[in-house]
Amino acid sequence: MKSKNSMSVLCLVDGEHYFPVTKSAVDKIESKGYDVKLLLFIGGTEKLRDTNVDIISEMFNKPVLFGQDHSKVPYDLIEESIKEYDVGMVVDLSDEPVVNYSIRFNIATIALLNGCMYKGSDFEFKALEEEDVLNNPSYKIIGTGKRIGKTAVSAYTARLINKDSDFVPCVVAMGRGGPQIPEIVRGDKIHLTPKYLMEKSDKGFHAASDHWEDALMSRVLTVGCRRCAGGMAGMVYETNMVEGAMMTNDLDVNLVALEGSGSAIPPVKADKQIVLVGGHQPMETLTEYFGPYRIKLADLIIITMCDEQICSREKLDDLLIKIHEINPNADIVPTIFRPHPVDDISNKNILFATTAPESVQHLLKDYLEENFNCNVVAISSHLSNRPLLQRDIEENIDNIDCMLTELKAAAVDVATKDALNKGLEVVYCDNIPIAINDEYDLDKSIMNIVYEAKESFNKKD
């Protein structure tokens, strides 16, 4: 985000307060050392006796601005004023009925997208702090929630880019189980076997952390980082990702992917952004609150989990319309995930451990059996629930000769461990994003972002 003058303030006021009351509040703000640049009236007329801007400005001794329609919040003027006056904080001195929860989230989105704090009498939203530390072109992969496929898309994207001779990509990932010191994993050089990851787990590492999955599935260099907590607009409480990103400056790479965690956003400045939206998520999560904030950040939006069993055609159509209304400039690609084992499972009797919902188990079973010549004995959708996963394994382990598992959650310390202890083969499984029809070209959309990131980075020189 652009650096702002944190002491420079835009006040949002209304006509539901008498001017002397509002002026007292403005004076109080300035008594704390802030510089109120402008008063913007955002609605309400009950106590608004005069709309003569010159008279009101003289009373407040401040520039005053009105929208054309006093019954509507002038969102466009809020954004224009932030930019024109280079304010670092928007202070909301309004109240019901002029504003409500939805309106305030809309205002917050505008403020945060423009690098401003948005503050009211009992709330405060801070703009994302991004460190500009990379010496190579970069893109972010962030999401509107957890378990929507960020790591799968990140690995797929890295593999795709790695096929292009112009690029040597790497992935910097932060996770809730990441290392205390940023960790380089040479996915481009080492073979990550179940036994190797089990040894890591036995030493206390979270061997199913995102950067291990990235390294195994993408076969590119990864840097693993940690983060704790995630704010409503994506800021983390603590992370070592900035240090991890800086490490890439000394590596033999020329493109950096910054992978978010859950709905938390990497605090490192990137040239382009890919935002993942889960087709299974409630509509209001995406169109209300800070859903629009994340969607507006995107240059490319990938909607995942668009199987009709998860996201009905009606919902998807509605989602496409609403996302386009929020961010008309972003490319949008709806996708489904399909499993892809990293090793041969031909003629194997398998138990497949996944985070995919039970509603699509029959699709996954058919896909695996038809494409990989195996027999799916059972599928457990409890990879992120250790007790239930343990139960599923115990019920089926005597009937299988291969454990097929995604590399996340309890994949190593439960699924891999139990299978190896029984002398069974363990094969890890990738999830491949596939566009829902030929109208969309996922690979082309991704590579467009990559080349745009390179172009944007080169323009800085």
UniProtKB/Swiss-Prot annotation:
User: What's this protein's function?
Assistant: Catalyzes the formation of cyclic 2,3-diphosphoglycerate (cDPG) by formation of an intramolecular phosphoanhydride bond at the expense of ATP.
Q: Which InterPro entries match?
A: Cyc_diphosphoglycerate_synth (IPR016557)
Q: What is its EC number?
A: 6.5.1.9
| Protein keywords | ATP-binding, Cytoplasm, Ligase, Nucleotide-binding
Family, according to the entry, reads as follows: Belongs to the cyclic 2,3-diphosphoglycerate synthetase family.
| UniProt feature coiled coil, ranges | none
**A cellular-component GO term for this protein:** cytoplasm
Q: What class of enzyme is it?
A: ligase
UniProt keyword Ligase, yes or no: yes
* Transmembrane regions listed in the UniProt entry: none
Origin superkingdom: Archaea
Catalyzed reactions per annotation: (2R)-2,3-bisphosphoglycerate + ATP + H(+) = cyclic (2R)-2,3-bisphosphoglycerate + ADP + phosphate
- The gene is cpgS
State any single GO MF term. Answer: cyclic 2,3-diphosphoglycerate synthetase activity
Subcellular location as annotated: Cytoplasm
HAMAP family recorded:
Cyc_PG_syn
Name by which UniProt lists this protein: Cyclic 2,3-diphosphoglycerate synthetase
Span of the secretion signal?
none
A single GO BP term for this record reads: gluconeogenesis
